[in-house]
């Protein structure tokens, strides 16, 4: 989760988040290199007292500054498309979880497990042992290293189910069902919040995901039944 004075991404807890962080590092490296070169050229032009008044055109330079940006854009394009398709493609999920947005709480359903369902409300943050505006009364429990499908929709306005450390952000739109892959690579508790302004209490509908071992997950399922 995010902490004070944290300027980078949260620690990634899924393979999709790993890919997104790597892609971000690649793009940032390219941006820094281009920005440094541009600043150097501008500074050099201002400091240089010499100028060539007879240089009106140069085909070699024009070819270079046309080809180089194309190559850079392709370097950015291919990893981006790969990550988008990896996140969007649903391949043999072990089971599905439904996430339903309401004003202003989330509901979760496990249709393959005797249709387990429950609501998840934000807890009162008067307890100092809790994270302010992030703790919920019921957590979404998932097994780690198991591919799942997250299905989300809304009953009223547009919400957005977002857990940054899992690399997930999907809109919950009324009358529409969106889906994407969900997988956690380690046990832990991951926090998120609705990321679509949805009304007065938009800031008070947190998301709390607990990733556990498969054995513990089955025990939790049995207790719910």
UniProtKB/Swiss-Prot annotation:
Catalysed reactions, semicolon-separated: 4 Fe(II)-[cytochrome c] + O2 + 8 H(+)(in) = 4 Fe(III)-[cytochrome c] + 2 H2O + 4 H(+)(out)
Lipid bilayer topology: Multi-pass membrane protein
Cofactor: Cu cation
EC number(s) recorded for this UniProt protein: 7.1.1.9
Mitochondrial intermembrane domain ranges by topology: 1-25, 83-225
GO cellular component assignments: mitochondrial inner membrane
Ligand binding (Cu cation A2): 194, 196, 198, 202
Localization of this protein: Mitochondrion inner membrane
Cystine residue pairs: none
MF GO annotations: copper ion binding; cytochrome-c oxidase activity
PROSITE patterns linked to this entry: COX2, COX2_CUA, COX2_TM
Membrane-crossing residue ranges in chain numbering: 26-47, 63-82
A family per Pfam: COX2
One GO process term, biological-process aspect: ATP synthesis coupled electron transport
Annotated Cu cation A1 binding sites: 159, 194, 198, 205
UniProt cross-references to InterPro entries, sorted A to Z: CcO_II, CcO_II-like_C, CcO_II_C, Copper_CuA, Cupredoxin, Cyt_c_oxidase_su2, Cyt_c_oxidase_su2_TM_dom, Cyt_c_oxidase_su2_TM_sf
Cofactor note: Binds a dinuclear copper A center per subunit.
Mitochondrial matrix compartment residues: 48-62
Function of the protein: Component of the cytochrome c oxidase, the last enzyme in the mitochondrial electron transport chain which drives oxidative phosphorylation. The respiratory chain contains 3 multisubunit complexes succinate dehydrogenase (complex II, CII), ubiquinol-cytochrome c oxidoreductase (cytochrome b-c1 complex, complex III, CIII) and cytochrome c oxidase (complex IV, CIV), that cooperate to transfer electrons derived from NADH and succinate to molecular oxygen, creating an electrochemical gradient over the inner membrane that drives transmembrane transport and the ATP synthase.
Quaternary data: Component of the cytochrome c oxidase (complex IV, CIV), a multisubunit enzyme composed of a catalytic core of 3 subunits and several supernumerary subunits. The complex exists as a monomer or a dimer and forms supercomplexes (SCs) in the inner mitochondrial membrane with ubiquinol-cytochrome c oxidoreductase (cytochrome b-c1 complex, complex III, CIII).
Family: Belongs to the cytochrome c oxidase subunit 2 family.
Name of this protein: Cytochrome c oxidase subunit 2
Gene: COII
């Amino acid at each position: 989760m995010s902490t004070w004075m944290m300027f980078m991404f949260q620690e990634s807890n899924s393979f999709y988040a790993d890919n997104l962080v790597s892609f971000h590092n690649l793009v940032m490296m390219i941006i820094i290199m281009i920005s440094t070169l541009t600043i150097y050229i501008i500074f050099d032009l201002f400091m240089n007292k010499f100028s060539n008044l007879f240089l009106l055109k140069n085909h070699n330079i024009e070819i270079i500054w046309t080809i180089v940006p194309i190559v850079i854009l392709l370097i950015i394009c291919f990893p981006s498309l790969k990550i988008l398709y990896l996140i969007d493609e649903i391949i043999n999920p072990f089971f599905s979880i439904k996430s339903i947005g309401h004003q202003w709480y989330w509901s979760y359903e496990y249709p393959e497990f005797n249709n387990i369902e429950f609501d998840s409300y934000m807890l009162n943050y008067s307890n100092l042992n809790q994270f302010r505006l992030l703790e919920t009364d019921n957590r979404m429990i998932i097994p780690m290293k198991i591919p799942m499908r997250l299905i989300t929709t809304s009953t009223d306005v547009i919400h957005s189910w977002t857990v940054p450390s899992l690399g997930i952000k999907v809109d919950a739109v009324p009358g529409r069902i969106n889906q994407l892959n969900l997988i956690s690579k380690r046990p832990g508790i991951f926090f998120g919040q609705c990321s679509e302004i949805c009304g007065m209490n938009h800031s008070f509908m947190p998301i709390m995901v607990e990733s556990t071992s498969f054995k513990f997950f089955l025990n939790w399922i049995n207790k719910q039944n």
